[in-house]
């Protein structure tokens, strides 16, 4: 029994690693395993090696020489695979750079130092990227927390991320972060920390929001709250050192969907009940691994997605109310005057197939007059940016470079003073 258990554990480790290269399934409940194990294998491969090694060290002394040799051989194959995933993650700057060059041109800006980066001597709080950093990063930057932007209690709260030495009288560019969670879970804390901490350290003001969730709330409550948060930010962010005239929006998964939809429906009264006159325009959008078309039934839509949406989010059948799903799809609202977009998606996404991003980007490029950048990241799973992995750090730098190019191209009327950081 002990021998069998050891062999099963070593083979399970090999399957875990292989799933990081090619998900075992993108349909049904197995997709959940493919996502859960895949994101750990691809984003935390070193930790996975240590875990597998520790487990093998515990059981190995009790095995016969033959079984021990087999389990070690299988485990070594798994570790070599994990080292390959580590190498792919650390090289994620290559597809990101290629995407930026293709979308913005090879003469694009490579950094943003002369635009808004004004670090005061000794005032920086940035630390080296890493998973451990993410455990403490919130307290370094989220100095204004649980601010109300609406009337729905904690679901209408937001946090403001900034450097503690940021001049509140300045006009820092602003990033609005929309959390994901299948429109039913998710919180302003715990997502996009690598990106927000990177930009906050450079002198940005970042706003992370909560919004109403299903099944307690029903679509379009989620996008209404996002729009209300944009309106609040435009009205109040100057009090915290932000520029109300320059706001970019981002989010992952459901947040990717909501950020894209918000960017493509500025001032749309259907999504602004009671505040139709509020300005909800944004200057750029950076959706991560989002859903962009709810009307499809092919391989671009996870087979469990539509039943979940019908039962818990929209609470109507798609075949009976197709317009509700069509209007909720960002691809429906692609327009010539869309803001610049930077779309990021992993090739191995088991929850939202990469085909969603491909078709959305194709429509944007056909229609929009503004730059459209698309980065497809090899071996990246859903939620690849949650941990402080090398891939997440590269993605944060790429987003900075994209925003630097867009910010530098802003109309002269909006360039009212560059961000300055106060002396520490």
Predicted regions and their residues:
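Alpha/beta-hydrolase superfamily serine-hydrolase fold, recognizing
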Residues: 1-424
